[in-house]
UniProtKB/Swiss-Prot annotation:
The keyword Transmembrane helix does not apply. GO terms for cellular component: extracellular matrix; extracellular region. Contains keratan sulfate. Keratan sulfate attachment is observed in the cornea but the protein also exists in other tissues without keratan sulfate. The 12 kDa OIF in bone and the 25 kDa KSPG25 protein in cornea are probably proteolytic fragments. Bone and cornea. Belongs to the small leucine-rich proteoglycan (SLRP) family. SLRP class III subfamily. It is found in: Secreted, Extracellular space, Extracellular matrix. Induces bone formation in conjunction with TGF-beta-1 or TGF-beta-2. Glycans are attached at N89, N215, N246, N259. It comes from Bos taurus (Bovine). One of its GO terms (molecular function) is growth factor activity. Keywords: Disulfide bond, Extracellular matrix, Glycoprotein, Growth factor, Leucine-rich repeat, Proteoglycan, Repeat, Secreted, Signal. GO terms for biological process: articular cartilage development; bone development. This is Mimecan. Residues 1-19 form the signal peptide.
Length: 299
């Protein structure tokens, strides 16, 4: 009877007992009030409190998701795909590497080893003192308005056939200080051609190389390995520099016309032949058509 009364009193006071807040509860405690039913009730309540207040949160904080092979492959493909391999000509845009100003492109001393892609409106290219070894037809295929090219101080030893064939407006071509052994076919409207300080020999210049260049005024072929003066030099020439080659002789037809004693070549202002083995004094008839004698050795 006393036991029954005690049990009833406990049931009456249980609703008045409030559990501590979740932050103050010890989730490991199981309240035991001396009866199996009460123990089970409080154990269930504690379990629910743990599940609702802490378990889900803790699981979110510590959950580690291990993707299967398929999802990992998708993630790899979409988020960490490696960059494609760099192409041979995949370089920095020309106008970032060089300076582009109103149709002029300045690529001087930037260590390029090939002609960079040029803006289509380019008229002047200065690519001096680089490491360019070869010029090809595709370098200028889509740049028809070029008027001046300057490749001074490169390593050019080969110029592909047809490289300048589409440059009908080109007026000045400078290939000084390179490694050339021969000359390419030159565009017809050239007024200046400069190929000094190369390794050009006479056999590297075809007989008709200069013949049709009716606008050519300035020709610089000094400091090469020429054994003779190039043939068929155009009447338009004003300045001819051939000093410091290996020229050993000249003829009456080199600058004049042996069969026409009245012929005067009045446009030529300067011919330089010093530094060659030839003795100009031995060929007096070679200069009778000139207003000024060539510079060189006469004795």
């Amino acid at each position: 009877m006393k036991t029954l009364q005690s049990t009833l009193l406990l049931f009456l006071f249980v609703p008045l007992i409030k559990p501590a807040p979740p932050s103050q509860q010890d989730s490991r405690i199981i309240y035991d009030y001396g009866t199996d039913n009460l123990e089970e009730t409080f154990f269930s309540q504690d379990y629910e409190d743990k599940y609702l207040d802490g378990k889900s949160t803790k699981e979110k904080e510590t959950m580690i998701i291990v993707p299967d092979e398929k999802s990992f492959q998708l993630q790899k493909d979409e988020t960490i795909t490696p960059l494609p391999p760099k192409k041979e000509n995949d370089e920095m845009p020309t106008c970032l590497l060089c300076v582009c100003l109103s149709g002029s492109v300045y690529c001087e001393e930037v260590d390029i080893d090939a002609v960079p892609p040029l803006p289509k409106e380019s008229a002047y290219l200065y690519a001096r003192f680089n490491k360019i070894k070869k010029l090809t037809a595709k370098d200028f295929a889509d740049i028809p308005n070029l008027r001046r090219l300057d490749f001074t101080g490169n390593l050019i030893e080969d110029i592909e056939d047809g490289t300048f064939s589409k440059l009908s407006l080109l007026e000045e071509l400078t290939l000084a200080e390179n490694q050339l052994l021969k000359l390419p076919v030159l565009p017809p409207k050239l007024t200046l051609f400069n190929a000094k300080y190369n390794k050009i020999k006479s056999r590297g210049i075809k007989a008709n190389t200069f013949k049709k260049l009716h606008n050519l005024s300035f020709l610089y072929l000094d400091h090469n390995a020429l054994e003779s003066v190039p043939l068929n030099l155009p009447e338009s020439l004003r300045v001819i520099h051939l000093q410091f080659n290996n020229i050993t002789s000249i003829t009456d037809d080199t600058f004049c016309k042996a069969n026409d004693t009245s012929y005067i070549r009045d446009r030529i202002e300067e011919i330089r032949l010093e530094g060659n083995p030839v003795i100009l004094g031995k060929h007096p008839n070679s200069f009778i058509c000139l207003k000024r004698l060539p510079i060189g050795s006469y004795i």
